[in-house]
Structures are given as structure tokens and as C-alpha cells.
Amino acid sequence: MTAVESRPAGVIGTSQSPSHRPFGARVKAFVALTKPRIIELLLITTVPVMFLAEQGVPNLKLVLLTCVGGYLSAGGANALNMYIDRDIDALMDRTSQRPLVTGMVSPVECLVFGITLAIVSTLLFGFTVNWLSAWLSLGALLFYVVVYTMILKRRTSQNIVWGGIAGCLPVLIGWSAVTNSMSWAPVILFGVMFFWTPPHYWPLSMKVKEDYARVGVPMLPVIASNKVVARQIVIYSWVMVVVSLLLQPLGYTGWFYTAVALAAGGMWLWEAHGLQNRAKAEVTGGKLKEMRLFHWSITYVSVLFLAIAVDPFLR
């Protein structure tokens, strides 16, 4: 999942000596390392699945512990991602105000912070939730840091497709936190998030593809035309909507979720096809309106998972 960061073009962050790093600013910098806005979306997909697994209101203490563990785990992954990507972050407009680039946090501090969060989150999950959730959480962190950030991101245009698996695991964690087991319901929702991730991220990549091209990151919009990217977005979008409708036939949800999934999915497909039509017409610049789909993708996943949480009470 993705949050947009920006700065005036051409402004490069500069290192700061310890004496010029106020305590309050330092605290904010460490919080920024965790990418809170992204984690909000991850938790939006975790908590509703707990309602689905419980078929009602789950234990609130369990929800709190799962949210705290999830935040720490995702925060650790994000901090380690920033540590690894600090070289290219300094060259990209949208990331050059990150704490490592500005010097508000040193690389060693960031590395220690990320590893500490990873360890604490795993132990918290294991001792207060269950060890299945702990291993899933650790697996998500390692997949994001090692497989996506270190291996895929700078090597293949399919980076976000397979790297996005890390962002799909919170639905499994939400289910396992309640049941200490797996079922087809979280697997289906894993599929929804898997096919959601590329058409969520590619519109943003279309907007900032010059940034990625500058640092040699082969995002699909960097190496392919807008027509090709838009066609891929439409394909993934259709599969995502179809997968989202599998819960009711298998008996996991009722009419309410299905109605919301159809309505929200229909709006998504409208936006996706609109982007494809503009790309086919070779519209460029602001008229391409690629960010409309990016913003709608966040609304879509929020509405869909809210429906998952509400549906058990209407059956």
C-alpha cells in the first residue's frame, strides 16, 4: 500500500548534526520511519477480518494486541525499507524529505530501530496472540524487506506484483489471530489484496515515473507505454472484483457484503476503463487523471473491508 510524499522539485535533503536535531523533531522522524499512513490501510484490512472470523465482535483485547503487533511489524519493515533505499530516496522528489535523507535519523539508528521493531512485534504476537500470527507477521516483514526491497524492486517490472504479497498477509494475520488456524475466507481475501495491489500502485507510478526512471527502478510505467499499463490495470481489476465475489458462494458472507462488493467493484471498473480509454487516446499530463484510480483504490478497499466487518451482524 502507498502514501504520497512530495517536495518542491530540485530541493535535496541535507544532513543535520546531532546538535541541530530537536527531540520533538526526532520523535516525529522515527514515527515517519514507520510510514503511519500506509499502516493505517494495513490495519483496515486486518481488523474487519477478525470480525468475519468471529462472526461478530472479537475480543477487544485481542484486537488491540493484534493492531499494536501489526503496527510494530509493518513499521519495522518500513524502517528497514528506508534504510536499504536511502540512496535512491535522496534522488527522488517524492521521497527526499524522508528522515534518513534529511539527516534527522542516521542509517545506524534506522537499522537498529527497524530490527528492534521486528523482534518486539514477533515476540508480542507470539506471547499475547498466537505463534501462527507471529510467524505470518515475521514472514510478511521478511518478504517485504528481502524479497521486494532487496531482490525485486530494482530488477523487474513485476516488482510490485510479487512484492505486494507482503501487503496481503495482514488478512491472514487477522483471521489467525482469532482462530489460530487458516480457512478459505482469508485465502480469498488474500487474493483480493494480491490483485488489488498492482492497479492501486501503478497509477501512482504513472504519475511519478520520471522519479523511478531517474534512479533506475523499472516500475512497469517506466518501461511500458501508458496503454500497456492501463490494459494491465484493467485485467487485474476484473480479476480482483471476481475474486471479491467468491465469499458468499462459499458461505462466508451474506447479501450485504455482496451488494457492497458489486457496487464498489463496479465503480472501480468504471475508473479503470476510463483510465484505459484516456491512455488509448494518448492523453498525457494532468488530463490522464491516473490519480483518480489511485485515490479510489484506497476508498474501495476501505469500503469493502468495512462491509466485511458489518456483514456478520446482518445475516
Swiss-Prot record:
The record ties this protein, via InterPro entries, to: Protohaem_IX_farnesylTrfase, UbiA_prenyltransferase, UbiA_prenylTrfase_CS, UbiA_sf
Q: What is its EC number?
A: 2.5.1.141
Localization, per the record, is:
Cell membrane
A biological process from GO: heme O biosynthetic process
Which chain regions cross the lipid bilayer? 38-58, 62-82, 111-131, 132-152, 159-179, 184-204, 233-253, 255-275, 293-313
Family per record? Belongs to the UbiA prenyltransferase family. Protoheme IX farnesyltransferase subfamily.
What is the annotated role of this protein in its UniProt record? Answer: Converts heme B (protoheme IX) to heme O by substitution of the vinyl group on carbon 2 of heme B porphyrin ring with a hydroxyethyl farnesyl side group.
Q: What name goes with this protein? A: Protoheme IX farnesyltransferase
* The organism of origin for this protein: Streptomyces coelicolor (strain ATCC BAA-471 / A3(2) / M145)
Q: Which gene encodes it?
A: ctaB
